[in-house]
Amino acid sequence: MPNQYEIYKCIHCGNIVEVLHAGGGDLVCCGEPMKLMKEGTSDGAKEKHVPVIEKTANGYKVTVGSVAHPMEEKHWIEWIELVADGVSYKKFLKPGDAPEAEFCIKADKVVAREYCNLHGHWKAEA
């Protein structure tokens, strides 16, 4: 059963969905169950995928990776998300954009997540 904020992807057509309200059932696309995109927190590519969270005067700045992630036509960050106090904030990106987002919110604890079109879903907490 899917849980709130989980990300699923169709292995056939590439559709991606985020669960906003967890119901009772499986997510199906193109006649097959969708694949849960587990959140990576570290691996050999950590310097390019794990979000870096910085507290700012106005809220939080999230940069993808301690080394700038490529933002090319074939390899880019599709979105950056910040979850704070049960609320999800997103910035959608496109090739050529900077792999970063600023969120003007007040919260003590946040989770940053991002999605790379080639390497999947990544997260960090602060």
Curated annotation (Swiss-Prot):
Entry similarity comment: Belongs to the desulfoferrodoxin family.
Effect of C13S: No effect on activity. No iron present in center I
Note: Catalysis occurs at center II. Fe(2+) ion of center II is the electron donor and is converted to the Fe(3+) form during the reaction.
Keywords of this entry: Detoxification, Electron transport, Iron, Metal-binding, Oxidoreductase, Transport
Enzyme Commission designation: 1.15.1.2
Protein name: Desulfoferrodoxin
Domain notes for this protein: Is organized in two protein domains. The N-terminal domain has a fold similar to that of desulforedoxin and contains a mononuclear Fe(3+) ion, center I. The second domain contains a different mononuclear iron center, center II, with a Fe(2+) ion.
MF-aspect GO terms: iron ion binding; superoxide reductase activity
UniProt cofactor note: Binds 1 Fe(3+) ion per subunit. The iron ion 1 is coordinated via 4 cysteine residues. Binds 1 Fe(2+) ion per subunit. The iron ion 2 is coordinated via four histidines and one cysteine residue.
Primary role: Catalyzes the one-electron reduction of superoxide anion radical to hydrogen peroxide at a nonheme ferrous iron center. Plays a fundamental role in case of oxidative stress via its superoxide detoxification activity.
SUPFAM superfamilies attached to this UniProt entry: Rubredoxin-like (SSF57802), Superoxide reductase-like (SSF49367)
Residue ranges crossing the lipid bilayer per the database entry: none
